[in-house]
Structures are given as C-alpha cells and as structure tokens.
Amino acid sequence: MAGLVEKDIRLLLKRKQTVILFLAISFLLGFTTDGSFVIAYLTVLCAIFTASTISYDEFDNGYTFLMTLPIDCKTYVAEKYAFCIGGGFIAWNFAVIFYFVSAVIKGDSINLSEDMMMAVVFIPVYIIMLCIMIPIQLKYGGYKSRIVLLVLWGIIALIGFVGAKALAGLNVSIDGLVKILDQIPDIAFAVIGIAITVLIMVISIACSRKIMEKKEY
C-alpha cells in the first residue's frame, strides 16, 4: 500500500502549480470573507483533488498495469479511501490553523470551543462526499463521473428546495425545528454523526470493491 500512496503523491506533485494556485486563493479568501468559509473550501477542494488520482490510474490502461503488481482490488480500494480521507484531513488541519491565524491578524473575536465545533462539522461532510465520489468515479471513469456527480448534486439540491417549500406549505417553522434541534445534546449529535458517517463509509467501500472486482484487466 505504501507504494500506491507514493504513486498518488507523485501524481499530485506533478500538479503543484495548481496546488499553489488553490493555496493562494484560500489565503485571499481567508482575509476577504468569513474565515470559516476557507475551512470548507480548502477541505472539500483537497478531497476532490485527491480523488482525481483515480482518473490518472485508469488512463492508458493504468489499471491493467497496477494489477500486475503485488496488490489486489481490496488493497487498491483501501489505499484510495485512506489517501483521499487522509489528504482531506491534512487540508482540514491546515485550514483550521489558517482560520485562527487570520482571525488573530484581523482582530476578530475567537471562541475556541464554538469555533472548533464548527470546524469539526466539516470532517464528516467531506468524508461522506468522498464516499459518494469514489465509487462513482471508479464505475464511470473521469469524464462520465463528472456528469453523474453533477446530476446527483442537482437532484440533492432539488430535493432540499422541494423539502423546504413543502415544510413552508405545511406551515412548519424552520426556526422552530432549529430550536428543537438545539435542545439535543452535542454529544448526541456527535454520536449520530459518527455512526452515519461510518455506515456510509462501509457501504461505499463495499460498493467500490465490487466495482473493481467486476472490471476487466
């Protein structure tokens, strides 16, 4: 697995100019927008960037070559999830540090417990996003997966919009729902969030393994 990780790192280093550009944009956003935005931006961006290594693997019969090495489909899938999630976590740490540094420089007030709780919310979000992206990219390839993901995000946005309209039509107060949720202990939210994230990850990994096993090399 170490060899696969090194391969992916070298693939990303070939795009170091893009990485530098993204970091520069993150730096500007950190000082010109709400600092919390840079945490979401940099974490999600890195997750997408690391997942793009799948496209390189399939290019020019790359899978055929990889499967001649002493690895199997399970090892490849495990490495891909570990690399993408690990890369996103590194970016998250960098973004959190940058958030606090920029807040100090701008003279913004800092509430460590609330700010960290806000930042931690982005971890399961980007992991779930990766759990959706990776099997789709393995199944449909680089080009088709972009179309599938675009349609999927559109459907999710439409469901959210229709759901909000339906609640408004039923005279259900969004603020009332928020107040009810605020009464739930933070630890309960954390346990539920972790459980849902782990469940989605297990299902996603199982799907990715089946997709890789069905491929012809």
Please identify what each model-predicted range represents.
Residues T68-C73:
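Short helix-to-coil transition segments within interhelical loops
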Residues T75-V77:
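Alpha-helix N-cap/helix-start motif at helix boundaries, enriched for small hydrophobics
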Residues M1-N61, E79-Y217:
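Hydrophobic alpha-helical transmembrane segments of membrane proteins
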